[in-house]
Amino acid sequence: MLRAAVAAAEELRSPLLRVIGTLRDGRGSVLLGRRVRFCSNSSASDTEAAVAEAEAKAEDASAAEGEADSKASSAIVPTSTNIDDCLSVIALPLPHRPLFPGFYMPINVKDQKLLQALIENRKRSAPYAGAFLVKDEEGTDPNIVTGSDSAKSIDDLKGKDLLKRLHEVGTLAQITSIQGDHVVLLGHRRLRITEMVEEDPLTVKVDHLKEKPYNKDDDVMKATSFEVISTLREVLRTSSLWKDHVQTYTQHIGDFNYQRLADFGAAISGANKLLCQEVLEELDVYKRLKLTLELVKKEMEISKLQQSIAKAIEEKISGDQRRYLLNEQLKAIKKELGLETDDKTALSAKFRERIESKKDKCPPHVLQVIEEELTKLQLLEASSSEFSVTRNYLDWLTVLPWGNYSDENFDVHHAQKILDEDHYGLSDVKERILEFIAVGKLRGTSQGKIICLSGPPGVGKTSIGRSIARALNRQFYRFSVGGLADVAEIKGHRRTYVGAMPGKMVQCLKSVGTANPLVLIDEIDKLGKGHSGDPASALLELLDPEQNVNFLDHYLDVPIDLSKVLFVCTANVIEMIPNPLLDRMEIIAIAGYITDEKMHIARDYLEKNTRQACGIKPEQVEVTDTALLALIENYCREAGVRNLQKQIEKIYRKIALQLVRQGVSNEPDHESVSASVTEESGNGDNTTTKDEILKDPAVEDASVTNNVTNPASEEANEENLTSEAAKEDSTSKGNKGTDGAADKAIEKVVVDSSNLGDFVGKPVFQAERIYEHTPVGVVMGLAWTAMGGSTLYIETKKVEEREGKGALVLTGQLGDVMKESAQIAHTVGRAVLLEKEPDNHFFANSKVHLHVPAGSTPKDGPSAGCTMITSMLSLAMGKPVKKDLAMTGEVTLTGRILPIGGVKEKTIAARRSAIKTLIFPAANKRDFDELASNVKEGLEVHFVDTYSEIYDLAFQSDAGTETS
């Protein structure tokens, strides 16, 4: 008997098959017999008795086998209670779709109290509950199913809160099965909630709803039902969801009455829950049919769309398969005829052809590796990952320029010409480079020292490297190591890694196509260091001429001869370069450009190139020398000329805007610019070109910029044209012709020192000379900064005077070294004053305040020692120092003057401030003598060994110190 009950339950597994049986007009279903009934038109009948009898027999059989689990039940439910007597039911929330009469719906009940109540109902032979759809929360889309989150929030609701979230109209459902928390419901008839009876579990009073009376023979009703039946049959035929039961459904669908037909159509549709709830709530059968017709029509359109998409995809897949098969057949036919070889043979032939021309120059160990890899390639399947790795490896091995060298040019006169073409000034740097080339001419090769160009940003280090490559007729390749922290960037990845690649040097050789390029390693002082190793240590093997003969890249894993490669490095601060690397380099310092050199560069190179780049003709604009001089001295004091180029570009952009507003239209100048270098770009490949003419010494790598600008002034002047420019603009507009010619009569735009601020804003740097005649206690010193040289005033003032209370107060953001220099200066000054004026007790009785403007700028260094002594003595004796005098030098406790650095920069700063007399340490005389004559011209320079000589120069007019 138990087996019979289980068999009966198995027959109920397909929900829609059971629906067919329940929805027919009182005629028993062949599939379900009389085991299930449709609740809306049944009372205590023979069907109920049969169901009860079958269930009783099943329970007796299960009791005979053993005690059943309390939470489990068979699919056949005893229903001794009359369904019309169900006026108070437990409310079950349905989160996703309403339950229609005649349909089964499985739900999960997480609330143990509710689950226990359902089990108790079944035991009392009253297995009924009310199933009500849950309303959406405000602001949610009913078309989006929120899943377990919404179910969890519903489970937390109790009593009135849950009642508010339920739709009033639901379905009286029979509890057909309970397995754990899994409950299966069978819908019977429509209900409406009237009031709440109990809060937990939620129990409500309900009214049983009946359809409104209708005329079965109404033509409109019949036509609508026929259309619904026709559409349903079409949906069932086209939908993949019901394809296994198409024959059964379409056979019995015509037997449904109107109300059950409407419920059936709405239940199998994929409409959202609100539309389905609307069908459930509709008691007018005709309106319900119309609503269902809309839903099934939409379902049919969706089914057709789904079918068309599936068909298109299937056709595409079959078409691709057909093409693939035809291609394979074609390959096989060609192979049989000898017209085509397979991929592996073609690849091997390509690699052998590449290496054939280099066989005589290629090292034997490399040829051996290539042959081994070619043999390995033939044994691998083309679809394997190892095949791809081997193919890429062979590609790199065969593409490298083994033994291919470019012819070098060691002509010193040719090199001198190129260096002069590309750069103005820098005579000492050019001389060092020519010496290097001369040694290469005598040796026949440039193998040897590694050049390191050091200097501030914008002085032309990178472009000098290009010029050397042009002079030697070598290919040029640049890569920056600034911030590089991965050794694999230099030495490559091992082939075992996915996506492995060779290092930069192997990529360089492939890019330039020669084995002796000039490689510029930019920003070598900014090498990083991370968990992936130390790149500085990896560069040791690369740069050392004794080791790079057999440089081993991790990817290639064969020795490569890099001894013919000329390496040029650039750095801003050589102190940041690791000592083992620095020891292998020949340092060439590039101090920067003086004002005269900047004037020539701006006039001959920068202005000309910028004017052409902006499309402006020479007759349309004039930038005077006074404007360029003011631009250099008041806006661009840095050692390089990169910022000067930016300011000139800003001027010409504003001029271009004025000309366009005046209606000027120039034909573009078509100038061919050819390049002879290969330069690394961010992530792209390098390119090799010929005969580049680079005349802009400011062109250097863009990864380091250290220019001082005034952002506020720049922004303001970028947005507004000047009043002077506006006047010229209006004047030019007044002079325009009316004949429509391309070149219209305009007034020439002139930029001079008077209107320079209208184009580039207010000056960034103010005049360094504060005093025309230095007062008592004030002396001008000379300092070195990152921007070059500058003048520096030392000011002293007596704060108070009390016997025996001599002291020194320091301000001006002085560093530790400068504070120590001030203490030494105070001691030495006291000794000098005691020697010169024994009766003057100024230092013993006076508290002196020493200040170094500007207060916001940090300052440090020992070179202001002699200036501090002179300032204190001037205050102590009440004498001002000699006019137009500036000095620099470190002083010892015994009054000796020690050498300092930055002689060139400090001399330029003195000339800029119109200083005529300079005092330097005697040890710096050689540095001063090496300066260009135009830098030294017009200066009276004294070189001193002791402070007593400075005292005579500063406070007496009959000094006899050595003068230059």
Curated annotation (Swiss-Prot):
The record ties this protein, via CDD domains, to: RecA-like_Lon
Q: Where is this region: Disordered?
A: 663-740
* Recorded effect of pH on activity: Optimum pH is 8.5-9.0.
* The organism's place on the tree of life at top rank: Eukaryota
The GO annotation for biological process reads: cellular response to oxidative stress; chaperone-mediated protein complex assembly; mitochondrion organization; oxidation-dependent protein catabolic process; protein quality control for misfolded or incompletely synthesized proteins
**GO molecular function ontology, one term from the record:** ATP binding
Q: How does activity depend on temperature?
A: Optimum temperature is 40-45 degrees Celsius.
Its keywords, alphabetically, are: ATP-binding, DNA-binding, Hydrolase, Mitochondrion, Nucleotide-binding, Protease, Serine protease
Q: Which InterPro entries match?
A: AAA+_ATPase, ATPase_AAA_core, Lon_bac/euk-typ, Lon_lid, Lon_proteolytic, Lon_Prtase, Lon_prtase_N, Lon_prtase_N_sf
Its subcellular locations are: Mitochondrion matrix
Q: Where is the Lon N-terminal domain?
A: 89-300
Q: Where is the active site?
A: 863, 906
Reactions this protein catalyses:
Hydrolysis of proteins in presence of ATP
Q: What is its main location?
A: mitochondrion
**Residue stretches of biased makeup (Polar residues):** 673-687, 703-712
> Where along this sequence does the record place binding of ATP?
455-462
Compositionally skewed regions (Basic and acidic residues) per UniProt = 688-698
Q: Where is the Lon proteolytic domain?
A: 773-957
- Please share what else the UniProt entry notes about this protein: This protein may be expected to contain an N-terminal transit peptide but none has been predicted.
Family that this chain belongs to:
Belongs to the peptidase S16 family.
- What is the purpose of this protein? ATP-dependent serine protease that mediates the selective degradation of misfolded, unassembled or oxidatively damaged polypeptides as well as certain short-lived regulatory proteins in the mitochondrial matrix. May also have a chaperone function in the assembly of inner membrane protein complexes. Participates in the regulation of mitochondrial gene expression and in the maintenance of the integrity of the mitochondrial genome. Binds to mitochondrial DNA in a site-specific manner.
List the HAMAP family. Answer: lonm_euk
Alphabetical list of PANTHER family matching this protein: LON PROTEASE, LON PROTEASE HOMOLOG, MITOCHONDRIAL
Its protein name is Lon protease homolog, mitochondrial
- Which organism encodes this protein? Zea mays (Maize)
